[in-house]
Every structure is written in C-alpha cells, then in structure tokens.
Amino acid sequence: MENYQDYECQEVKSIHELYFETVARHAEEVAFEYSAGVVTYSELNERVLHAAGRMVPYQGKQVFIGVLDPLKFAIAYFSCVLSGCVAVLGAPDDYDVFQKSGGNAQLCITDSNVFDGSAGKVPLGAYSVSDTDAVCTILHSSGTEGAPKWVMLSHANICSNIVSGLRKYLMRQVDVFYNIIPYYHAFGLVCDFLAPLFVGAKICVPDKKELFFSQMAIFCPTALNVPPAVAMRLSHYISVAGSAAAVTGGRLKKILCGGAGLAAEISKRLREQGINALGCYGLSECSPCVSVNRDEFYKDGSAGIPLGCNDVSIGGDGEVLIRGTNVMKGYYGDEAETCRILSGGVLHTGDLGRIDGDGFLFITGRKKNVIVFDDGTKCSPEIYEAQIVAHTDAEEALIRIGNGQPMRLEALIYATDNSKQDEIRRYITDLDINKRISSVLFTNTPLPKNSLGKVQRNYEKR
C-alpha cells in the first residue's frame, strides 16, 4: 500500500468564507435530515441570516453556545461567528463553569432560545473578517494534562485544519453523515459539522441519541465520525444481526474514529464486515486534527499520517510535538499554562508516540499516565491495555496502581463473557509486567468514559 496524491480542496481562510462558499454552491442540496423532514442549505442560510441580525448587538463579545441539536447549533454558531462574536462552545451546564473561570459571555444560547424567525435579517456578506488570526471560537477541553481548559481557536486555525484534512481524507457532496458527537467537542465541530457542510454533504440526525443504532438503517449513512467505543458497539450489533446492511442500511463504507485511540483489532473486524474503520489523532489545541489514516493508505493501530497544516516530531523523551497553523492561540484566561504548553511555537501534547519509516504516527501513551516503579523502571499502561483487548475477549482494560499497595498494579477488565476470565488471566500472566500486577478484577459493565469514549482513568473504584 502506497501513499497517493492529495484530494482537491478549495482554500478558505475564514469561517465567513467557508460558510458563504458553502451556501452558494449547495443551496438546493439537503443540509440536515430528521425523521420529521429536511432542511436545505438555502433554508439554513435564511435562518442563519435572520439569527445573525439578532446577534449584531453582541458583535465583538463572547456568546456562550450550549446547544445540542445539530440544526439549532448550526444556526447559533454561524450567526454568532458571522456577526463578529466569539462563540464559546460547551455543554449546557458549562456556562457557569466558563463564567466562574473568568469568562465574560454576554449571552447564553441553549436549544430553547436559539434565535430563529423573521427578525433582523443580515444581508449576505455584510460582515467580513479583516484578521483571520482573530479568535472566533473558544472550546471547553480537558487540556493536555487533564485539567479543564478553554481553548482559543482562530479562523485560520480551524480553516487550515479543515482544508488540510479534506486533502487527506475524502468527504464528498454525495456523502450522508449521521450524527452522534456533540458539536461542542472539537472533533464534532470540525470533522462532523464544518467539514461535511463545506463539501455539501447531508447530515442526518436521530430522534434521540439513544436511538442512534436503531434508526441508522432508516437514514442509510455512507460515512460516520464516531469515538472508538461507538465503532466497537456497531461491530457487535453487526455480528448479532449477521450483516452490516441490516444495521446500517447497506451504504456505510467507512468510519473515522477520533477522541481516543482505535485498536487495530476493531479496524480489522469492521473491515471484515465491509466497513473501513480508520483512526486519527488530534487535540482541541490543534483544531483538532493532527494526523489521519487515508482511505487507501492506512495502518491499523496507527494514528495515520500528519496533515499538511502541521509538522509532527518526537521529542527526546518520546513526547509528540506539534508546530503548525492549526495550533491554538492559547488557553483563555491562563497565560501561564499557555506558555508552559506552547514553547517557541511548539505544542507539547503530553502524548507519547513514535513515527515509523512510512511516516505513520503511533500514540503509545500519556506522559502523565507513565508509572515509575521504585527501582526506576517505567510502564506506559496504555500499551498493555491495548494488547489485552487485541489478543483476548476483553472488551476494555485498565491498568493502574492498586489500592494500598505502593507500586503494585491492578488490571480492571470489562468482559461480557464470564467463561473467558481464566483465558484472559493466562494472557495477562504472560505479559512482561505480570510480576507487577497484584490483582485482576473483572466487571460486567463498561468502564466509565467521557463523551468521546475515553476511559476515565481516575474514577472512583467500585
């Protein structure tokens, strides 16, 4: 398998340019589809411009957007940015968090008060962007070291990431996407919202998130952007149903997994089921994508090859370092942390990784998760967790320091088949860190995760 020429993608420098190009080229195409009906790009534009008229008094100010519905989010986000406001994105209950952390949002928009209707329509192109390096979006992020942060992104950050991403990973106007990721997450905002709309694709929305799988065959998506945990569940449902078409509607050809690492075993299993599951790597601080596996140039278990908008290198201690036009402007209200993470224009991700001879990036762990034993040896638990999941019937694995036993580890395993516990124990016995593991615990329920499928390593033990 060899790399190939980039896909073509028009250059855009600002959200304004992206939006106006989109509605001009795809006016009569369907932008959003619900079970109750569809909304075309021209209809979306009418709603956005009316809403933008209501946003004019807030020009230059912060506006918090805690909207979950995709169409309402589109109206709120585009009207906010087009009007020259700074969109602050988060879950609905993050508004107070932002304000208490030094935020100065003058307006809070939720699903119940999105501006829509006939008031105050703004003419197309009434506002332009004089400085594409100006901050247009602030995202709530866990931060590279786990502490919640507010990431400031500019027009140039976001647009360079979209364009570079579309040159490596194919999205087409004929594609049908199916939403489950909140758009207040960077992966959702860029990969599942802005990029699909930029190419004129259709975004379908289930009646409820809980109906995502049961309604999938109704909408017949061609592509998904989901966390690995969702990809794993999809593979399971396909196995139970006996065919991918019975679950997906028969048109799903590929999945892009972000937010957490995609295990090689899951990619292989889905490919055997007729779906190309590809992993990528990113951080909110990088707008968010850093690397991606291409449609016809990929390595299972890898994070893909770097996008053209950034340079990726590995530091002396194995840390992944990034420099590029997609790297954030900084953390809002935290100059000290910004200076610590961004040194000389280089983002210190806190992730450990390596780049192979073909240019593929592999993420091997987190610096903060490395366990240092009393004899000076070190362990990256993510490496062993991935091995356990890949080579046994364990659905999920978590290795961490055990209670009351300094420098002794415990392995917590989620496995749905209790009869496989002895087999999993035997595999763990053969690992080179087995002598460090004092206990292997099993659970019949999935390990707690955040909304993008990352296991919460420090949750309270049950």
Annotate each PLM feature:
Residues 9-11, 15, 28-57, 70, ...:
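Conserved AMP-binding/adenylate-forming core of the ANL superfamily
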